[in-house]
Amino acid sequence: MSSTFRNLCRSSPWKWTSLRFEYLERPGTGANIVRAWLRRPGALRLETPDGQLLHSTTGINDSRDDFYVSATRRSWLLPAHLVTPVYDDAGLVRRRPEAAYGEPSFGNGRLAAALDPVELAGNAPVPMEFPDSNPVSLEEPREVDHEGRVALETVVTRGRSYAPSDPGEPLAHQGRTLIRIDAGTGVCVASQSLDGDTSGKGHWLKILGVDEYMLDDLFVAESMNLTDVRRHISWDIGPAA
């Protein structure tokens, strides 16, 4: 079960392309919930619970010629969903290839890490001879219900090789941390520090929709007044002749 948990932590980039969710930093209250729409790669919209816009990605259709002309090796990496990882028998990612990883986060490193929690597992399994070199050690994971979805829950303890994507906002705190990973998306839907000065700190994420159709109009600064094809369009043909 531990290997399943770690492989699930590596799998997020290949399990979904768009996500609609609510996010809460803990400790916090319902007033601090953020509603989010995310479409890979790089498109993010954030609102307050009452619909006030907090952030919307701009420039998602801009030319990237300056980026490629920079001619760095990283600038030519493909998005993760365009490269093929090594899968285990359950269809989870055992070994991640080199790719252009990264999630939009609007300055919140924990949110970006939660969307792709590979920092809890590393890009590949560690050698059997050195099990202590895992980024975190795990208690036996178990299946739980999280907001109506199946998740794997465990308590993790940081190892010497743990390297959070944002050192200031890690998923795993010093001491023990309760972690939940959504089984369908590979997203870390909950974290909570259990020890020390950080006790109670973490996050809670509620998934509302996966792989929904999202127009560009949702993410740009000004509406392009595009038609949402999901909505019924009525045709008024006037009175009969």
PLM regions and their residue ranges:
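Short acidic, gly/pro-rich beta-turn/loop elements at beta-sheet edges
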Residues: 31, 56, 164-166, 189, ...
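Short beta-strand segments enriched in hydrophobic/aromatic residues
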Residues: 25, 50, 158, 193-195
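N-terminal mature ectodomain segment of secretory-pathway/periplasmic proteins
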Residues: 1-92, 153
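A short, polar/proline- and glycine-enriched secondary-structure boundary/capping micro-motif
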Residues: 54-60, 165, 199-205
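Generic beta-strand hydrophobic packing signal
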Residues: 19, 141, 154, 191, ...
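Extended beta-strand-rich segments in extracellular/periplasmic secretory proteins, especially
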Residues: 88-185, 189
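Non-transmembrane domains of secretory- and envelope-associated proteins
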Residues: 93, 134-137, 146, 170-176, ...
